[in-house]
């Protein structure tokens, strides 16, 4: 893939009023012919000026028109071919960036790059042949590192940046506006420009306080000579950056100072990206340092053609800013991009428009015919300029109408898809039930076939005995009655005479045949209700009429003769059924074997007499069908309306052709419904409704065909459209038009939608305008010629400094000395300029080094301060908090690249629930009760406060659980406790415990205190003393 460098041009503006009032001197000179820019240091007038060479250099006398025609024109032309392009202005605040990008409406020569790009894009679009374009515009700004949509409903809403593997970095939720001409683009630009953040500073009264990006997205649909479609996509980013500024010059304070800080940070990140791209040793490009660099990521070193316009101020008091701008612009020349044509984008909206236009034209062609459609489209003249201007007055209304139309189409499509899915699921369920019923019928047929074989075997034995007797009698009487042979017919002749009668019944055309299951059922189960409940199917009620007629054509009880006849008919009928619908036994029986079986096993005389008395069943069926058709005709003539419901595609339509055929065969051969309803009209209506609901088509049935014919005569057919199911790459079934019956569409709505879609795309309106095409080619040639002139001028400047001048022949030695003196002076000036450049670079590097070291020292001091504060604060953190372990918090933390901050765990306090320790304060509710009973209000209030304190103490688990209970009892302020356990002698504890003065409710609640150590040693003494006192009391006389 070929790479190209970033194109860089410089433009120097005239001095403004402020600079003229300060009597500033110009320090910038420009050589436009060679694309060189010179800047003189005002503090060192003896030093040579610094020289920079770019792709173009423009001074105060040049207009924006010349800049665009020479430099920007090839880049925008590439966008109309499928490339990505970016044009951005770079420079300090008040250097003319917005003037270069936006410009002035009057005079026309000072119009900016953005409006000229509009004209260029639509000029190329109108001149293109066999190509359609979809042009959409968006406008955003980056204010204080927040992305805002300047064309959205809420211009202050923050938008997020996302990254896509194919689209790259994009803004989620950014509004896109379809534009059709230059006027709409200018109106969109003006709307966004009014919403942009601007402010007043000392250097510029209308200073841009945000970076803005106007994007034009172009989708190109071209058809080559072979008729093959090609889809491409191009994108043009027109960037107007906010300028870097110094607070000392702009006087920014408060909100303006905050804005300036954010602007300088983003521009500094942009400069770091440029430096990293130029430096080949840098492996990491800091695109994520700013949202501006992320949005320009593809423009700097990616798949984009990029043009940088460096705007300069000629004043000497802006020398440092101008020199910095020139250095960054000179570095940007070395950035290599790899642009390529974006072919066949997957998310192209133009592809969807083209497919929908084709579909709508197909629908209209089916309704009106191709000739009428072309005539109608030709009569629809495009709106004139006045009408288009009227429509352009409300682009928001047009967008809302478009969104409403999209929503309507989406809802219609989802409803149709849901209906198709429901029908498909119903058909699948019906098919499952059909297979189950087929299996049940096969099992029943096998049982009946085995019974028939057993009966035929017994009959064969009886017939063999009869034949043996007849042969014996024939041998005896052959000689005597040879002349009277015709009077007695042998059985062989009788069999030959009877066989055509048997075989003539089943040998009918396949359209009126009776299946193998129908014949046995008709003879063995004459009751229609029983067989209906056993063999009927929901999706095949249309065969009810035929089965009813069959049950009436073969009446009679279940006899052996009927069983034998049904067996013969079933074996003969097997020639018209496929083998896959037969079981293991019936598949083995071929038509020849069936005939051989009939010939070898002739029925007895009794079955033959019954067969002779039977009528032709198929003739009776035909008669009943004729009566049915006449009844249906009479019902139609008597205005009995049969509702006609549009058919939905069945499961057979969603399968392969072979599957469709087998489904129809199964429906014809195996779906039997026996019924005996007398009301024919009701039966016909039910069949039509059930057929429309389930979508099962029984085309081979004679009565269904007749009912369909009657329905066609009664009501007109709806529009035939095309519906099929195709599967997209994501695995979703999408409905596409095929030949099925759908509801009629509104012709006016389809035509309006078609015209709306065709108006969305533009291209080729002026393809036959020779003047416009010639102008377009002339501007393209001018840009190429200007590029060649610049290359030639640079070569001439290199030749002037070459060694070929030494070949000149001098007339005298003095002339040679003067020539070499001039050459020496020139080389000395170059050497001095190089030394000054080296000195400036070293001083700049030294200043950056000092700045970096100062920043590192400041960060180290801040880090030490935070570390000391942390060491002092960490012991104060509770142990049950997760932040008491900072190493664990450090391991759990992670850096968020997108948002630029650390993700740290939330502070959590772990509470451990321990059992509550019973203390002496548990008897306070009793005292509260006594206080309440006594009716003292102040005591009641005091008890309430004591209860609150006791609860707070009990909740403090860490202080109460391991606290000594002895100390709390000793230090207890309860006078009752101190009186009972500490002030009394040990011998009186029992008497005090039994004291009647205490309330009885407090006695069991008072806890037993732990004894003192001295009391435990005095236990024997106390016992003896108690015994002695008892004796003394007992011995003393009362």
Swiss-Prot record:
GO molecular function, one term: microtubule motor activity
Main location: cytoplasm
InterPro entries: Kinesin-like_fam (IPR027640), Kinesin_motor_CS (IPR019821), Kinesin_motor_dom (IPR001752), Kinesin_motor_dom_sf (IPR036961), P-loop_NTPase (IPR027417)
SS bond list: none
Domain of life: Eukaryota
Positions that bind ATP: 91-98
Subcellular location: Cytoplasm, Cytoskeleton; Cell projection, Cilium; Cell projection, Dendrite
Tissue-level expression: Highly expressed in the gray matter of the brain, especially in the hippocampus.
UniProt keywords, alphabetically: ATP-binding, Cell projection, Coiled coil, Cytoplasm, Cytoskeleton, Microtubule, Motor protein, Nucleotide-binding, Protein transport, Transport
GO biological process: anterograde dendritic transport of neurotransmitter receptor complex; intraciliary transport; microtubule-based process; protein transport; protein-containing complex localization; vesicle-mediated transport
Domain Kinesin motor: 5-335
Biased composition (Polar residues): 533-551, 636-651
Biased composition (Low complexity): 983-1000
Ranges in coiled-coil conformation: 346-470, 748-855
Keyword Membrane in annotation: no
Alphabetized SUPFAM superfamilies for the sequence: P-loop containing nucleoside triphosphate hydrolases
Pfam families associated with the record: Kinesin (PF00225)
UniProt xrefs under Gene3D superfamilies: Kinesin motor domain
Record GO cellular component, one term: photoreceptor connecting cilium
Region span, Disordered: 379-401, 503-559, 636-657, 916-940, 976-1038
Functional summary from the UniProt entry: Dendrite-specific motor protein which, in association with the Apba1-containing complex (LIN-10-LIN-2-LIN-7 complex), transports vesicles containing N-methyl-D-aspartate (NMDA) receptor subunit NR2B along microtubules.
Self-association and partners: Homodimer. Interacts with APBA1 (via PDZ domain); the interaction is direct and is required for association of KIF17 with the cargo that is to be transported. Interacts with IFT B complex components IFT52 and IFT57. Interacts with IFT70B. Interacts with PIWIL1. Interacts with TBATA.
Similarity comment: Belongs to the TRAFAC class myosin-kinesin ATPase superfamily. Kinesin family.
The protein's name in its UniProt record: Kinesin-like protein KIF17
Lineage: Eukaryota, Metazoa, Chordata, Craniata, Vertebrata
């Amino acid at each position: 893939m070929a790479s190209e460098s970033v194109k860089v041009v410089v433009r120097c503006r005239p001095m403004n009023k402020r600079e003229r009032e300060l009597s500033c001197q110009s320090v910038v000179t420009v050589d436009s012919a060679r694309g060189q820019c010179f800047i003189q240091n005002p503090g060192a007038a003896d030093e040579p000026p610094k020289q920079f060479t770019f792709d173009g250099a423009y001074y105060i006398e040049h207009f924006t028109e010349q800049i665009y025609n020479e430099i920007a024109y090839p880049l925008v032309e590439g966008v109309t071919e499928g490339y990505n392009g970016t044009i951005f202005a770079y420079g300090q605040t008040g250097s003319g960036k917005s003037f270069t990008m936006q410009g002035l409406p009057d005079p026309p020569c000072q119009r900016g790059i953005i409006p000229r790009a509009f004209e260029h894009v639509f000029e190329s679009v109108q001149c293109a042949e066999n190509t359609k374009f979809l042009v959409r515009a968006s406008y955003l700004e980056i204010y204080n590192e927040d992305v805002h949509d300047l064309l959205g409903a809420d211009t202050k809403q923050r938008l997020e940046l996302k990254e896509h593997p194919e689209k790259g970095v994009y803004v989620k939720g950014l509004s896109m506006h379809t534009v059709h001409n230059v006027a709409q683009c200018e109106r969109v630009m003006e709307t966004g420009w009014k919403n942009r953040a601007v402010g007043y500073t000392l250097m510029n009264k209308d200073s841009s306080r945000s970076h803005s990006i106007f994007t034009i997205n172009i989708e190109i649909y071209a058809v080559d000579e072979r008729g093959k479609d090609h889809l491409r996509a191009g994108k043009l980013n027109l960037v107007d950056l906010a300028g870097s500024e110094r607070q000392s010059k702009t006087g920014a304070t408060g909100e303006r100072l905050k804005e300036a800080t954010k602007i300088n940070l983003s521009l500094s990140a942009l400069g770091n990206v440029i430096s990293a791209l130029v430096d080949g040793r840098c492996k990491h490009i800091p695109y994520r340092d700013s949202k501006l660099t992320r949005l320009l990521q593809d423009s700097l070193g990616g798949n984009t053609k990029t043009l940088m316009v460096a705007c300069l101020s000629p004043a000497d008091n802006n020398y440092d800013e101008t020199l910095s701008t020139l250095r960054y612009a000179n570095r940007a020349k070395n950035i290599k991009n790899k642009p390529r044509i974006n072919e066949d984008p997957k998310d192209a909206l133009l592809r969807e428009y083209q497919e929908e236009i084709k579909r709508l034209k197909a629908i209209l062609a089916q309704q009106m015919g191709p000739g009428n459609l072309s005539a109608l489209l030709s009569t629809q003249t495009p709106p004139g300029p006045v009408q288009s201007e009227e429509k352009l007055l409300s682009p928001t209304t047009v967008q809302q109408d478009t969104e409403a139309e999209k929503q309507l189409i989406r809802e219609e499509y989802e409803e149709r898809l849901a209906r198709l899915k429901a029908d498909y699921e119903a058909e699948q369920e019906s098919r499952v039930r059909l297979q189950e019923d087929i299996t049940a019928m096969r099992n029943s047929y096998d049982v009946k076939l085995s019974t028939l074989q057993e009966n035929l075997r017994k009959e064969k034995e009886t017939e063999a005995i009869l034949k043996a007797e007849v042969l014996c009698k024939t041998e005896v009487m052959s000689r005597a009655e040879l002349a009277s042979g015709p009077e007695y017919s042998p059985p062989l002749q009788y069999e030959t005479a009877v066989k055509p009668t048997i075989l003539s019944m089943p040998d009918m055309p396949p359209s009126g045949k009776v299946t193998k299951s129908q014949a046995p059922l008709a003879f063995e189960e004459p009751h229609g209700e029983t067989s209906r409940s056993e063999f009927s199917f929901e999706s095949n009620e249309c065969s009810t009429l035929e089965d009813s007629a069959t049950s009436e054509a073969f009446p009679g009880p279940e006899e052996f003769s009927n069983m034998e006849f049904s067996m013969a008919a079933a074996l003969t009928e097997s020639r018209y059924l496929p083998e896959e619908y037969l079981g293991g036994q019936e598949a083995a029986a071929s038509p020849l074997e069936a005939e051989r079986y009939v010939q070898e096993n002739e029925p007895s005389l009794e079955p033959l007499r019954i067969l002779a008395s039977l009528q032709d069943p198929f003739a009776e069926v035909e008669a009943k069908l004729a009566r049915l058709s006449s009844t249906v005709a009479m019902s139609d003539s008597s205005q009995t309306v049969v509702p006609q419901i549009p058919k939905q595609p069945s499961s057979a339509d969603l399968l392969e052709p072979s599957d469709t055929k087998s489904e129809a065969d199964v429906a014809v051969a195996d779906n039997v419904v026996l019924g005996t309803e007398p009301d024919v009209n009701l039966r016909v209506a039910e069949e039509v409704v059930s057929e429309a609901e389930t979508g099962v088509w029984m085309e081979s049935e004679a009565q269904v065909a007749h009912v369909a014919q009657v329905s066609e005569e009664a009501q007109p057919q709806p529009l035939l459209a095309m519906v099929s199911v195709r599967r997209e790459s994501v695995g979703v079934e999408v409905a596409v038009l095929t030949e099925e019956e759908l509801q009629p569409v509104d012709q006016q709505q389809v035509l309006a939608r078609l015209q709306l879609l065709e108006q969305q795309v533009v291209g080729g309106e002026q393809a036959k305008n020779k003047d416009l095409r010639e102008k377009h080619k002339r501007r393209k040639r001018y840009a190429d010629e200007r590029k060649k002139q610049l290359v030639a001028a640079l070569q001439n400047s290199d030749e002037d400094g070459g060694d070929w001048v030494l070949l000149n022949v001098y007339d005298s030695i003095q002339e040679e000395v003067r020539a070499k003196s001039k050459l020496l002076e020139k080389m000395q000036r170059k050497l001095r300029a190089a030394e000054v450049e080296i000195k400036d670079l070293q001083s700049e590097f030294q200043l950056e080094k000092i700045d970096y070291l100062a920043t590192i020292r400041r960060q180290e001091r801040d880090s030490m301060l935070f570390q000391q504060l942390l060491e002092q604060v960490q012991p104060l953190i509770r142990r049950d908090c997760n932040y008491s372990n900072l190493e664990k918090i450090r391991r759990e933390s992670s850096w968020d690249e997108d948002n630029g901050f650390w993700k740290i765990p939330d502070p959590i306090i772990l509470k451990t629930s321990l059992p509550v320790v019973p203390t002496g304060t548990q008897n306070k509710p009793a005292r509260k009760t006594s206080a309440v009973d006594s009716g003292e209000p102040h005591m009641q209030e005091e008890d309430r406060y004591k209860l609150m304190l006791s609860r707070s103490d009990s909740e403090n688990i860490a202080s109460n659980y391991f606290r000594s209970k002895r100390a709390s009892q000793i230090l207890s302020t309860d006078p009752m406790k101190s009186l009972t356990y500490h002030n009394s002698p040990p011998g009186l504890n029992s008497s005090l415990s039994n004291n009647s003065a205490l309330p009885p409710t407090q006695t069991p609640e008072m806890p037993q205190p732990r004894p003192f150590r001295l009391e435990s040693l005095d236990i024997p003494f106390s016992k003896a003393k108690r015994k002695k006192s008892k004796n003394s009391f007992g011995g003393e006389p009362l």
